[in-house]
Amino acid sequence: MVIDRAGYRLNVGIILVNDSDRVFWGRRSGHDAWQFPQGGLAPGETAMQAMYRELHEEVGLDKGDVEILGSTRRWLKYRLPKQYLRHGSEPLVIGQKQKWYLLKLVTSEQKVRLDLSDSPEFDSWRWVDFHEPEQQVIFFKRQVYIQALKELEPLLKKERRTPYGLKRKRGNQRA
């Protein structure tokens, strides 16, 4: 776990989209809470390395299963409410500082596996409309989700264009 001087845990978030621009939305194991895949950086690990590790651990996908469409320009952060702070742990983590990645699924969704870890993060998942997570995520993560989705959404439109500015057809076909 990597924590900055201010007490924020360095973390990556993953927005995985399909050909219909719907996003992967996972239900946390044992909770009625939904979120994007995310996870902390290990010491010496880059954000991109952490992103691929978390993608595999939480969703069962590897580098060849996705295309990186982009990432947030800066780290986005949120503070944990007092009731979520773990006062008995050292160092005290007051929130998360996250680098967000927008990934396009380029393989079959049948490759998604939630059971590759001894303690899976998710027990269920579904595709939802691009902005639906903004309303469903737990309240203290909401602003970061809004910021990440707003910043990364234009990359979907850019990805659909050819060098001549024509829209790409849905699916694997190119216009």
From Swiss-Prot:
Motif mapping: Nudix box: 39-60
Domain Nudix hydrolase: 7-150
Signal peptide (UniProt feature, chain positions): none
The keyword Amino-acid biosynthesis is assigned to this record: no
GO molecular function list: pyrophosphatase activity
Cofactor(s), names only, from the UniProt record: a divalent metal cation
Keyword terms: Hydrolase
Entry keyword Ribonucleoprotein: no
Main EC class the enzyme belongs to: hydrolase
UniProt-listed Enzyme Commission number(s): 3.6.1.-
Pfam families assigned to the protein according to its UniProt record, in alphabetical order: NUDIX
Similarity annotation: Belongs to the Nudix hydrolase family. RppH subfamily.
Function: Accelerates the degradation of transcripts by removing pyrophosphate from the 5'-end of triphosphorylated RNA, leading to a more labile monophosphorylated state that can stimulate subsequent ribonuclease cleavage.
This protein's name: RNA pyrophosphohydrolase
Gene that this sequence comes from: rppH
